A protein has these predicted regions:
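C-terminal interaction segment
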Residues: 2-22, 43, 57-64, 70, ...
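Acidic-basic catalytic patches of nuclease active cores, encompassing PD-(D/E)XK
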Residues: 27-55, 61-69, 73
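Short acidic/polar active-site loop segments enriched in Thr and Asp
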Residues: 128
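Short beta-strand and adjacent tight-turn residues that come in two discontinuous sequence segments
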Residues: 132
């Protein structure tokens, strides 16, 4: 958490500042990856009001420095919705100095300082987890996670990687999102199970409804079969009773009374 010496009234507000670093994203994938993570997170944190996930939004850490706009970042311990409405930028002195605990950078064909200047800046700010996703890599891991330890970034190995301070894991998996069949980033729980996407949740609920309908139909069929079986048994009993009665009548005609035997 950063502290500012200047009185807050003297510092510019979000309305006074540009919404981003004014540098356009140079890959559609950058936004799609972050969008998917945010959409999944909305389901994981449903009902919570103490988190915010920004995408390509300007993060202002000093009134004397330009904003930096990560492809995605997560802050826990801030209001999900500001009283004045939607955030146009993330201004640290308006967020009680809460630094994003998680920052994501997606590498495109042209490097933008993900391994140098940005990494150093996030380290100096105190961002706990710095995640670099480099899908164009072939020989090295496409997902790198760094954890801040004694003011230095230390790589964390694994897939997924659990981040206990924020209660989430980050990892990668093959998936078809918006008709794009490829590797995507996902959130994971502590057991290493991947959280479902909104589309998967809808499909799962649909399957549950269909299974419930099938079970109800099967129960109805079993009940109907039981009724039919009971009816057949009763008919057989009735027929047996008629046969027994006819047999008894025939014996009486022959002078034989079964009751006297």
């Amino acid at each position: 958490m950063l502290k500012y010496l200047e009185p807050l009234d003297w510092l510019p507000t979000a309305e006074d500042l540009p919404e981003s670093d004014e540098k356009p994203v140079d890959s559609e994938l950058q936004r799609l990856v972050a969008d998917l993570l945010r959409n999944i997170l909305a389901g994981i944190f449903k009902g919570r009001t103490d988190w915010f996930f920004g995408i390509d939004m300007g993060v202002y850490y000093s009134p004397d420095e330009p904003a930096i706009a990560p492809d995605g970042f997560l802050s826990i311990g801030v209001k999900s919705v500001k009283t004045k409405g939607l955030r146009t930028s993330y201004v640290l002195w308006e967020e009680d100095g809460v630094i994003p605990q998680f920052v994501l950078e997606v590498v495109s064909k042209s490097y933008r300082g993900e391994y140098t200047s940005k990494k150093d800046l996030y380290r100096n700010l105190g961002v706990l987890y710095y995640v670099v996703y480099n899908p164009i890599r072939r020989r090295k891991n496409t997902l790198e996670v760094y954890r801040l330890v004694q003011e230095q970034y230390v790589p964390v190995i694994g897939n997924p990687i659990w981040m206990p301070e924020i209660g989430l894991g980050i990892g990668k998996d093959e998936y078809t999102h918006q008709d794009r069949d490829r590797e995507w980033l996902f959130w994971y729980d502590e057991k290493g199970d991947r959280y479902l996407t909104p589309d998967e949740q809808i499909d799962e609920k649909h399957q549950q409804v269909q299974q419930a309908k099938q079970q109800t139909q099967q129960a109805k069929q079993q009940t109907q079969q039981a009724k039919q079986q009971t009816k057949l048994i009763q008919e057989e009993l009735d027929q047996e009773k008629v046969r027994s009665q006819k047999f008894a009548d025939r014996l009486r005609q022959l002078g034989i009374n079964l009751d006297e035997l």
